[in-house]
């Protein structure tokens, strides 16, 4: 589970052996790979991204790519906003050791606050 907001970033990773790795804000970096502009709201979402986790000696790079771009929800009647949530494909590798096995997976990505500033 990873989170990023204007003021905070961090996350946890549960390994296959059950151990939990916690990531402090300085250990999580998000890189936009591709933007998608909604024809419905006009909002631009970073639907494809790389998440770099960890310190230099043991860094994991996780790439997230949507199964389809248009997964925007019109939630103006409930939350007052449009937001993007949907299915993604993932691939992960050790960023400092290319010989390590590439991992493939599926996931869920939620992107809020891209249509207009949210009132908290």
Residue ranges and their predicted role:
Residues 1-120:
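Structured soluble/peripheral alpha/beta segments that form catalytic or ligand/cofactor-binding pockets
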